[in-house]
């Protein structure tokens, strides 16, 4: 068994010993899993540079991962299900997303072991054992984040490797220097501070012609107390970096940790829980049979990469995962198995790993691909179900479902409505401001239904609801520019004049050479600007506003022609017909649509019940949908509220 030990550093009751329905009280175990894997085993051969890893006396490669496990105190009350929470940049995401809970924010000086907010306890009430496993060796050096401690690849003479790195840097305010990484991650240090072939580019749009910044104007350095101090982890620019501009740097770095062991840690941690005995440190021996993974955004892309590399069977040939929910990953994978890869890189125009966009697991792994409108307007969302040119639909196999959550943004909505949101998982604490109010629709209810349907599909053979997404054949998938005419009629909608679509690129040299754009498509919209395709939650199906998957950057943070990546918009309907007439808004006002709050909520309930009957929503979440809609009604009909 590749897991050689579990060192428990913290054991405590969850939520003060609160009982979660039939599963009873839970406890949290937090510590470190130790691994020793055979680098020559076929199960590990897909790992880049595995042959260059240092080995112990038994010829094994050792590494370790931080782990948090939530499980019932009485294991007899466990339903035999594991949910692998594929942590995002060191942060747990499954409980916050599926339980409507608050995720702790880790930063310098924060408590590394804050109490876990269980939210409404939904996952625990269903008896899931939830394991959160660190898989990144480059997460910011902040206590509390779950990380991987992986070995570095070495040359035949034992020296550290050198290689080319290409990364993008952008700030919400003017800065004198940048850390050479995304969101404070541990960077690859420059091998030569004076490297003449290092390149720094600046762009105003992701696909615009770059401006090459003369080498004499920038250095590998940081500004400290007014002095420029040489530092291989930073880049400094004479005159500073302007807010909102996109800066891309290509340079030679030194020191390459073996990133692919992160996927091995995920696989083997699940296999250990499913198959090992208590003598091997398993806290739940003999009770866990089915395992599912939830990954969102970055970690959804990681799951896509694991499936692509066929990394789901351990050294004993045993299947780890039985099903996965790949949420808001669009059509991308990532540099999760690359020499000098960057785990946090997440912009499609910076990615070498795009094609193939479709996923077909090589074994009977059940896969649900869920995306919001933001991934479609980002440009890669539609490519998981069309050909690369966007000319025709491409069908998936029987073990895959594709769901588009209409009118939603990348995150699970923002409440109360605002145009200012903290940049996700960013230790710098940047506040991202948008030109429109951000999206408010919380699609966590749809994810809960996906997990229940995934479990029934894998464990009982019950088919889940059919895929639902924009399609070329019925005209519901259209180029993004096709929406401009509609939105230009809505006062103050600020529809983007330019969508920077993903391009075919030659990454044999860095910076890469761009080529032809992919055929990216988005959902067509109705006369209110709401999307016609996908799964529409009641707040979208019975609307009080136009809900979109796009929003532009605000002048306060620069780059005003760029999409604020991941952001959606809420564009409220006028309250009254008088407001509508005064504004010249073609959309009916709230008072023209609904005679009263009671009528509106009755229609919301009807839409929620219909969605539950189709299987896309759980019956238990019908009333939650009504509650969310009532909150939105009260806000948008209050004359004193900010719209």
What are these regions (language model features)?
Residues 2-643:
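C-terminal His-loop and adjacent cap/lid subdomain of alpha/beta-hydrolase
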């Amino acid at each position: 068994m590749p897991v050689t030990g579990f060192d428990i550093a913290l054991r405590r009751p969850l939520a003060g010993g609160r009982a979660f329905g039939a599963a009873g009280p839970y406890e949290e175990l937090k510590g470190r899993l130790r691994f020793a894997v055979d680098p020559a085993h076929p199960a590990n051969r897909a790992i880049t540079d595995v042959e260059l890893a240092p080995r112990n006396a038994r010829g094994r490669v050792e590494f370790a991962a931080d782990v948090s496990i939530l499980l019932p105190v009485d294991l007899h009350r466990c339903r035999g299900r594991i949910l692998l929470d594929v942590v995002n940049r060191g942060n747990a995401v499954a409980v916050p997303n599926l339980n409507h809970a608050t995720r702790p924010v880790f930063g310098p000086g924060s408590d590394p072991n804050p109490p876990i907010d269980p939210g409404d306890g939904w996952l625990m009430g269903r008896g899931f054992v939830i394991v959160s496993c660190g898989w990144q060796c480059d997460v910011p050096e902040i206590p509390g984040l779950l990380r991987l401690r992986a070995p570095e690849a070495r040359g035949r003479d034992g020296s550290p490797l050198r290689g080319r790195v290409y990364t993008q840097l952008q700030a919400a305010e003017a800065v004198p220097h940048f850390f050479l990484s995304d969101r404070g991650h541990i960077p690859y240090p420059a091998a030569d501070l004076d490297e003449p072939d290092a390149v720094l580019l600046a762009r105003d749009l992701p696909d615009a012609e770059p401006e090459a910044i003369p080498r004499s104007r920038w250095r590998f350095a940081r500004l400290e107390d007014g002095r420029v101090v040489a530092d291989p982890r930073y880049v400094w620019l004479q005159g500073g970096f302007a807010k909102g501009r996109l800066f891309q740097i290509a340079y030679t770095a030194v020191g390459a940790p073996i990133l692919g062991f992160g996927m091995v840690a995920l696989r083997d941690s699940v296999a250990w829980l499913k198959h090992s005995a208590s003598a091997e440190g398993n806290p739940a021996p003999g009770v866990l049979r089915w395992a599912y993974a939830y990954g969102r955004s970055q970690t959804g892309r990681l799951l896509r990469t694991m499936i692509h590399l066929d990394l789901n069977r351990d050294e004993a040939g045993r299947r780890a995962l039985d099903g996965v929910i790949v949420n808001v990953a669009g059509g991308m994978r990532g540099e999760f198995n690359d020499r000098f890869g960057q785990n946090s890189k997440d912009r499609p125009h910076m990615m070498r790993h795009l094609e193939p966009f479709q996923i077909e697991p090589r074994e009977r792994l059940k896969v649900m691909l869920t995306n919001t409108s933001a991934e479609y307007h980002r440009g890669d969302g539609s490519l998981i179900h069309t050909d690369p040119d966007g000319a025709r639909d491409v069908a998936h196999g029987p073990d895959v479902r594709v769901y588009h959550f209409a009118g939603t943004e990348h995150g699970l909505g923002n409440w109360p409505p605002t145009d200012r949101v903290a940049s996700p998982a960013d230790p710098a604490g940047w506040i991202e401001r948008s030109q429109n109010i951000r999206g408010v629709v919380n699609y966590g209810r749809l994810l809960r239904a996906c997990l229940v349907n995934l479990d029934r599909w894998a464990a009982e053979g019950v088919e889940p609801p059919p895929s639902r997404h924009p399609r070329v054949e019925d005209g519901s998938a259209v180029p993004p520019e096709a929406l401009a005419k509609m939105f230009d009629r809505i006062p103050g909608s600020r529809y983007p004049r330019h969508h920077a679509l993903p391009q075919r690129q030659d990454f044999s040299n860095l910076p890469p050479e761009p080529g032809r754009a992919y055929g990216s498509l988005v959902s067509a919209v109705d006369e209110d600007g709401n999307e016609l395709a996908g799964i529409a939650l009641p707040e979208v199906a019975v609307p009080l506003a136009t809900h979109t998957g796009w929003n532009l950057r605000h002048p306060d943070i620069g780059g005003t022609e760029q999409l604020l990546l991941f952001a959606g918009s809420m564009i409220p309907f006028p309250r009254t017909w008088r407001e509508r007439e005064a504004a010249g808004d073609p959309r009916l006002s709230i008072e023209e649509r609904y005679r009263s709050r009671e009528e509106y909520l009755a229609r919301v309930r009807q839409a929620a019940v219909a969605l539950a009957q189709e299987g896309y929503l759980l019956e238990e979440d019908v009333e939650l949908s009504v509650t969310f809609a009532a909150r939105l009604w009260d806000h948008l009909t209050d004359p004193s509220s900010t719209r």
